[in-house]
Amino acid sequence: METDLYIPKDDQVIGAKYAESFWLFFFLSIYSAVHLYVLETPIQKQKAGSTADPTSYSTQSIITVALSALVLALASGDEVGYGSFLLVYSQFNLKFSESSGQYLTSLYWTFFTIGRLIAIPLATIMSNQSMLVLELCITIVASIFLFVLNQLTWALWIGTAIFGLGISAIFPTVMSLTENYVNLTGRFATAIIVGAAIGEMICPLAFGLFTTQENPIPFVYLVNLIIFLCAGATYFLIKEGAKSILEKRKMESKEDEREMSTIKVYPGH
């Protein structure tokens, strides 16, 4: 039996053959990631002979960046998947009209924008780690709320607003947090961004494959599953990030000792 991919467009059902476009974007993203990773810029060529930061591409730094990419892949995928298939879910599960579903989607992106604006002043009084934990807690509460009260219209409105508010600033917060842990070079930043883009491709595909007219409830299952996986990945990111900070401090201490020994050898300089 062929599985249909439902996309809100004049109440038509678009077949799963459109999933091929997602795979095309996937392979293009992988190609771009590999190409940008190995590409050497003129600045890097100039610095090739200089002493590089020994912690820049250490195993610990790579693990931390990989976890950051995973967190953003899950968070960005959940963010886009929720916004893309919210109209479908509201129409199939709670019998929303098309206009009501569009208002609901607008509410989601409105609170998403509000959350980004609120995050700006919060960033001046809270640490990146505290902000990320707070955002995840808000998003998890909203997703559980949507799961438990999935048959109530008012719950969908409230849960959608809270979900948009919570998930809005996870992306910039994770980027800022990662910069605290490692030296965020161009290659590392590219790997994280491409990881987020891959999540934005895979998660909506999963939403489309499992959210059907006959059974739209998997929508809230996926919302909860992805955000809990994101929370788990965040735990390991913070744990490995702490190790990266210790490694960086040790290397800086060794570098200071080396400089002090140089000064003792050449006291006149």
Which residue ranges define each predicted feature?
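Helix-loop-helix hairpin linking two adjacent transmembrane segments in secondary transporters
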Residues: 1-44
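A late C-terminal transmembrane helix in Major Facilitator Superfamily
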Residues: 182-216, 223
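Multi-pass alpha-helical transporter architecture, strongest
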Residues: 32-40, 222-259, 266-269
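Extracytoplasmic gate region of multi-pass secondary transporters
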Residues: 61-114
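C-terminal transmembrane helical hairpin of 12-TM major facilitator-type secondary transporters
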Residues: 126-174
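Small-residue (Gly/Pro/Ala) motifs that create kinks and tight helix-helix packing interfaces
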Residues: 2-12, 87, 119, 202-211
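Intracellular juxtamembrane helix-capping segments at the cytosolic ends
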Residues: 1-2, 168-183
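Helix-to-loop junctions at the C-terminal end of transmembrane segments
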Residues: 115-128, 211-212
